[in-house]
C-alpha cells in the first residue's frame, strides 16, 4: 500500500489487438482505485476493449534496495462527478512535482479537459522487495 500511495509513475499492462501492451503513466491512488488521465489513443482503446489490466509500481533506491507492487484490476472511464474528482486528485498530486522555469506560470490544465479520466479498481495485489542493510 505504501508504494502505491507514495509513487506517481506506474506501468499499465493490457491487451491491444491480441498482444501485450505496457505503457508508463502518471497516477494517483486513493486506497481503492488507481486514477489516470489520457487523451484518446492506443492505451484507452486497449483498456476499453479489454478492461482487465495489470498495474506495476516500483520504488528503487538502488539495485539492492527496492520494492515493487503488481496489481490486477478493472478499468473504467469516469464520468460527471467521478471525472471531476479524479482530475482534481491527479492535478493536486502531480502538479507540485512538475519542474518549471522560475518565471513560467503553472501549465493551463483546461486543454486536458478534452481527455479521459479513468480509474482501475485493484482486485489483487502482490509485492516484492529486496533490502540490504549496510554493514
Model-derived features with residue positions:
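Active-site-adjacent structural patch at catalytic or cofactor/ligand-binding sites
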Residues: 39, 49-58, 67-76
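Short beta-strand segments
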Residues: 7-39, 55-56
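A short macromolecule-binding patch
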Residues: 46
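Extreme N-terminal tail/first-helix region
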Residues: 1-5
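Broad gene-expression machinery/nucleic-acid interaction feature
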Residues: 22-24, 52, 70, 117
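Surface-exposed, gly/pro-biased binding rims or lids
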Residues: 61
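Charged, gly/pro-rich active-site loop segments
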Residues: 64-135
Amino acid at each position: 500500500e505504501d508504494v502505491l500511495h507514495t509513487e506517481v509513475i506506474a506501468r499499465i499492462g493490457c491487451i491491444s489487438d491480441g498482444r501485450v501492451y505496457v505503457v508508463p503513466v502518471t497516477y494517483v491512488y486513493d486506497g481503492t482505485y488507481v486514477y489516470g488521465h489520457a487523451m484518446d489513443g492506443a492505451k484507452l482503446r486497449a483498456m476499453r476493449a479489454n478492461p482487465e489490466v495489470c498495474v506495476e509500481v516500483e520504488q528503487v533506491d538502488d539495485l539492492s534496495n527496492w520494492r515493487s507492487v503488481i496489481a490486477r484490476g478493472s478499468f473504467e472511464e469516469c464520468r460527471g462527478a467521478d471525472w471531476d474528482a479524479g482530475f482534481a486528485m491527479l492535478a493536486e498530486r502531480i502538479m507540485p512535482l512538475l519542474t518549471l522555469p522560475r518565471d513560467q506560470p503553472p501549465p493551463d490544465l483546461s486543454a486536458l479537459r478534452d481527455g479521459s479520466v479513468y480509474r482501475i479498481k485493484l482486485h489483487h495485489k502482490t509485492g516484492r522487495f529486496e533490502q540490504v542493510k549496510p554493514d
